[in-house]
C-alpha cells in the first residue's frame, strides 16, 4: 500500500474543499448572514490539516487499483465529515449524525433529507447543500485528476474507482484530458440550464441551486414543496435537463466531435430513452383521471419519471398518492437508474443490459450446450471481466440491500417505508414512498438507522467495492 500518495491526495481534497466553501461564504456575505462565519472556520480547518499533508511530495508515485479504491473511499468520507461541520457549528443541523446524513446525502447526490422545514435555513446553508450535489455529481477526484503528480497511466486507476458504471472509457489519450472534457461538458450544461431558468423568471439564487441539484442529479430543493411552486415552463426545463444529465457523457463528446454515428449507436442510451418513453406513456394514462388534462398528466409523468430514473429526486406533486401501478413503475425505475458515465445513480442501464444478456446467453447454452455465444454491446464483445464484475456487483448489491432493510426494521416502521428508504438511499434517489415520500423526510429514523442509510448512500455512489475494501484486512498490508 502506497500510503504517501493516499495521504497526499486526501490533503489535496481538503484544500479543494476549502476552495469550494468559498461559494457559500460569499453567499453569506451577499445576504449578510452571520452563519457564514462557520464556513470561514471550516476553511481554516481544511487548510490547517490539508497544507501539511501536501507539503511533502510523494516519494513513490506508483498508484494501483487497491490504492485507487482506498483513496476514493477515504476521500469521500473525509469530504463528508468536514462538509458537515458548518451545519453543526451554525446550529442549522445541531445533531452531528443528522448533519453527516444531510452532507453525505448532498455529496452522493442522493437528496434524502432529515429537514422538515428547508426554507428556515440561511441562504449560505442552502447554497452549500445544493453545491455539494454539483461537487459530487461528476466526482471531486475526477476534478483534481489534472493536478495529481501521477505518471505511467496511474490516473486511470483513480478514475475507475470513482466513476459510475461497469467500465470507464478514455475520451482522449490522456486521462487528465478526459477529466477536463467531462468537467467542461458538465459546467457548460449547468450554465445553460441556469440561463434558461432565469429566462423563465426564476430568481438567480433559485436558478443556481436548482441547476446544481439537477446537474448532479441530487434533488435538494430550496423550497419545502420541492419544485411544485414553480411554473410549468420551469418544470419542463428541469425535466429536460434531469434526463440529459442522466445520459452517458461519452455521447455528448461524440456529438461535439461530430461522431454522430457513434453517439446514436450507444445501446445503453437508446434503451435509456426507450425506458423513459414507455414509463411516461403508461403513467400518463394511469394518472389522467387525477389531473383531467392529458397535457398536464403527461408533464407530471415526464417530470417524475425523469426525476426518479436519473435519481435526481425533485418532485412537483405527491406521487405517493398516485395509483399503485404508477408507484410501482417509479420504484422499479429507482433500481434501473441512469446511464453509466452520467451523474445519475442506481444499478445503471448498462448493468441491467449486461445482466439480461447474461441470462439470455445462459438460456441459449442450456438449449445448445456446445454453442459459443459472446455477450455484445454496441456491436462489440464485452470482456469476460466486465461481465463477471457486473454479476458480482449485483449479488453484493442484493446482500447489502437486504441487510439494510433488516437493520432499519428495528425502528418498527412499515415495510414500504423501510424498503423504499433503502432503495432511495442506496440508489441515490432521495424520496421513497409512505413516510419517506416526497412530502416526508428521514428525520424520524433512529441514529443507528441513519448511519446505516448513510453507509448505503456512500456505497451506492462509490459503486460498493471502494467502500467495502476498507473492511478487508489485506487492504492495509504494506506490500
Give the ranges of each region predicted by the language model:
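Membrane-proximal intracellular helices of multi-pass ion channels
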Residues: 1-479
Amino acid at each position: 500500500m502506497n500510503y504517501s500518495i493516499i495521504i497526499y491526495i486526501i490533503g489535496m481534497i481538503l484544500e479543494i474543499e476549502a476552495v469550494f466553501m468559498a461559494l457559500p461564504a460569499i453567499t453569506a456575505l451577499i445576504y449578510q448572514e452571520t452563519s457564514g462565519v462557520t464556513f470561514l472556520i471550516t476553511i481554516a480547518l481544511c487548510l490547517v490539516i490539508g497544507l501539511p499533508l501536501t507539503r511533502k511530495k510523494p516519494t513513490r508515485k506508483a498508484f494501483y487499483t487497491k490504492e485507487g479504491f482506498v483513496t476514493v473511499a477515504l476521500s469521500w468520507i473525509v469530504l463528508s465529515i468536514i462538509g458537515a461541520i458548518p451545519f453543526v457549528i451554525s446550529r442549522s443541523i445541531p445533531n452531528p449524525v443528522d448533519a453527516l446524513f444531510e452532507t453525505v446525502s448532498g455529496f452522493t447526490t442522493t437528496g434524502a433529507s432529515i429537514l422538515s422545514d428547508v426554507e428556515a435555513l440561511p441562504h449560505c446553508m442552502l447554497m452549500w447543500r445544493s453545491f455539494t450535489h454539483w461537487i459530487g455529481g461528476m466526482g471531486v477526484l475526477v476534478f483534481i485528476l489534472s493536478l495529481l503528480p501521477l505518471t505511467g497511466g496511474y490516473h486511470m486507476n483513480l478514475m475507475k474507482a470513482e466513476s459510475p458504471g461497469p467500465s470507464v472509457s478514455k475520451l482522449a489519450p490522456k486521462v487528465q484530458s478526459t477529466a477536463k472534457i467531462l468537467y467542461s461538458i458538465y459546467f457548460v450544461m449547468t450554465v445553460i440550464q441556469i440561463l434558461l431558468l432565469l429566462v423563465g423568471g426564476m430568481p438567480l439564487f433559485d436558478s443556481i441551486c436548482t441547476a446544481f441539484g439537477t446537474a448532479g442529479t441530487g434533488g435538494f430543493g430550496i423550497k419545502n414543496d420541492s419544485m411544485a411552486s414553480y411554473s410549468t415552463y420551469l418544470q419542463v426545463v428541469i425535466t429536460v435537463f434531469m434526463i440529459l444529465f442522466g445520459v452517458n457523457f461519452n455521447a455528448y463528446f461524440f456529438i461535439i466531435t461530430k461522431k454522430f454515428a457513434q453517439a446514436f449507436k450507444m445501446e445503453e442510451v437508446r434503451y435509456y430513452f426507450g425506458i423513459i418513453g414507455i414509463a411516461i406513456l403508461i403513467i400518463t394514462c394511469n394518472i389522467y383521471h387525477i389531473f383531467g388534462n392529458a397535457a398536464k398528466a403527461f408533464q407530471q409523468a415526464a417530470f417524475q419519471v425523469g426525476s426518479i430514473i436519473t435519481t435526481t429526486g425533485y418532485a412537483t406533486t405527491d406521487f405517493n398518492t398516485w395509483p399503485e401501478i404508477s408507484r410501482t413503475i417509479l420504484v422499479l425505475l429507482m433500481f434501473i437508474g441512469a446511464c453509466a458515465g452520467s451523474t445519475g445513480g442506481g444499478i445503471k442501464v448498462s448493468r441491467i443490459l449486461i445482466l439480461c444478456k447474461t441470462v439470455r446467453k445462459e438460456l441459449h447454452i442450456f438449449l445448445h450446450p456446445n454453442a459459443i455465444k459472446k455477450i455484445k454491446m454496441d456491436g462489440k464483445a464485452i470482456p469476460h471481466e466486465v461481465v463477471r464484475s457486473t454479476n458480482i456487483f449485483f449479488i453484493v448489491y442484493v446482500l447489502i440491500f437486504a441487510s439494510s432493510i433488516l437493520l432499519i426494521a428495528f425502528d418498527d416502521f412499515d415495510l414500504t417505508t423501510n424498503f423504499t428508504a433503502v432503495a432511495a438511499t442506496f440508489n441515490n434517489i432521495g424520496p421513497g414512498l409512505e413516510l419517506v415520500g416526497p412530502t416526508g423526510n428521514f428525520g424520524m429514523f433512529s441514529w443507528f438507522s441513519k448511519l446505516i442509510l448513510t453507509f448505503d448512500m456512500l456505497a451506492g455512489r462509490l459503486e460498493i467495492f471502494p467502500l467495502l475494501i476498507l473492511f478487508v484486512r489485506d487492504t492495509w498490508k504494506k506490500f
